[in-house]
Amino acid sequence: MSTTASQQGLTARAPALASWLDAHAETLDTDATLSGEVVPQLASAGLLRVGVPVELGGTGGTIGDAIDSVADVAAHSFAAAFVLWGQRTFIEYLLQSPNQALRDRLLPALLCGELAGATGLSNAMKYLSAIEPLQIRATDVTTLSSSGVGGGDTSSWRVNGGLPWITNLRKQGFVAAAAVDHEAGGPPSIFAIAHDAPGVHRSDDLDLIGLRGTNTAALQMTDTPLREDDRITDNAPAWLVRVRPAFLGLQCGMSLGLVRRSLDATNEGGPAARSAVADDVAALTDQLASLTTRLKSGVLRGEFVDTPASLFKLRISLAELVHDAATLEVQTGGGRGYLRGLSGVARRQREAAFVPIVTPSLVQLKNQLAAQREQQLKTGTVT
């Protein structure tokens, strides 16, 4: 899909959202004035329901359609796409959770934009790749019900710890997914932690250089009580392997949209500038089409569950493509792009700078791939 087609797609199916994003993209990046409005705007456009089964309140479609939605939004505002990624990824967690009661309780408010969903699993994804330990610990405080009747045990815990960086912690109300290590042993769990649960503290917004309208903050839990009906999964490692392709696939949608917008912006330069970079633009456009197809196909078919390295390589390639496309936009824009208020070039440079560091960062992925290759060399299983 070309950049222009992507933008026209959002303009055609969600004109009010497209206009709002175009009018406020700079504000969403530079301050928190409109941070409370992003999720409701996305919900009003129906984007939170894309790829969600109709019987669960969605509009149907696939996870590939949800990736396209993130890309479409990113072409207008990377900050809004970052929020959409967080919200839609949390929704995906519920769709893939065995806890139907939790899904029934939270999904309606998430789909209509009343409640914000924060993924909170960057730490868990690093844990899955043996990069860092889990940062939240649960103590079992289960007690036998007074009835003493079979089935009267109600599992419950108190959790302590924190996460230094979570997006979409909307002040009007949020629920965050967090991986928790059990003091008693056994596989870690993933819980849905509500903003108003006892002991939950949201910090002030982090002092970011961009994406300041994304409600990004730290979250701390002190003796926060959780019950079985708050648990997304009781086996985080096995569940994360299955959900990671959607987590990363939706995240990669942000890169797709940013590349499309930067490439489209090269057409806004003068004839001489366009001619000078025409071959480069054509090459990057072909790369974008190929990577988009591979990404969506791999996520849809479940290929990345068993071969996560392929997805890691795609994520790295897309980050490199973001850099190359943003550089071309600067070249064709010339001095005009360095003047305030005349274009979105400077904002997209900041957005492009964020892509390599969002978890999992390129450094983490490259180290993971290097470790895997070293292990393959030792075992003679290099492919």
Spans of model-derived segments:
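A generic N-terminal leader/anchor concept
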Residues: 1-60
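Generic structural signal for well-ordered, non-transmembrane alpha-helical segments
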Residues: 257, 282-289, 312, 316-323, ...
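Glycine-rich beta->alpha junctions and the first turn(s) of the following alpha-helix
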Residues: 206-289
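Glycine-rich phosphate/cofactor-binding loops in nucleotide/flavin-utilizing enzymes
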Residues: 336-383
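C-terminal helix-coil-helix/basic helical segment that borders enzyme active sites and/or dimer interfaces
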Residues: 22-30, 271, 289-323, 327-340
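Glycine-rich flavin
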Residues: 34-44, 48-160
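A short core secondary-structure module
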Residues: 162-200
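A generic local secondary-structure boundary/capping motif
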Residues: 105-108, 125-128, 135-137, 163-167, ...
